[in-house]
Amino acid sequence: MVRDRTEEFAMLIDAQRSVLMVVDVQERLLPVMQDPERVVRSISMLLAGAARLSVPVIVTEQYSKGIGPTVVPLREALPTDALVLEKMAFSAAQETVVADAVERLRASGRDQLVVAGIEAHVCVLQTALGFRSRGCDIAVVADGVSSRAPHSVSAATARLLHAGCQWVTTEMVLFEWLGRAGTDDFRSLLPLIKAD
């Protein structure tokens, strides 16, 4: 059941309820995106936070035989238990192996999907809308997505917001996952945040 929009936008992103989904940041696709370094930096920070705070990670790869695997900096940053799943559908929600993985995590109480990747107006948009329609709370990371053209990101943003998805930043996610200062987790992640 979908909550009313006031409650949705008041929701904080909770590390205990989250899954991080990294969509199609692949070798032959990333170089033609706007500001690819920003995307890699953002997702690297999210992966470090997810690893530290035990947030499950799902990585999708669109037709990796043709587009290549996930880029090396992100592959090297993946937690050891991250799921890397192949897909052909633009929406990961339409790919059974991905949808089943998300559903297993939802059954354990992880109903918030934090989404980053490329392209914002194609696979990210369709994935976010697909899982939104399945009842997940969706937060799309603004600095962790890109497209070939800026107007494509703008159009995706408008549609996602209209559909009840949240538009957030990497720091918003990390600080909401942390929840408080003074903890070992906070001290561990603070240098990474300050370096950005």
Question: Where in the sequence are the language-model features?
Answer:
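A short alpha/beta connector and helix-capping loop motif
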Residues: 15-18, 33-61
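Conserved Rossmann-like nucleotide-binding pocket used by diverse enzymes
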Residues: 21, 58, 114
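A cross-domain feature marking catalytic cores of carbohydrate-active enzymes
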Residues: 25, 59-62, 142
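Active-site-adjacent betaalpha module
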Residues: 2-16, 65-196
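Short acidic, Gly/Ser-rich segments with clustered Asp/Glu that frequently serve as metal-coordination loops
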Residues: 27-31
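N-terminal nucleotide-binding beta1-loop-alpha1 segment
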Residues: 18-25
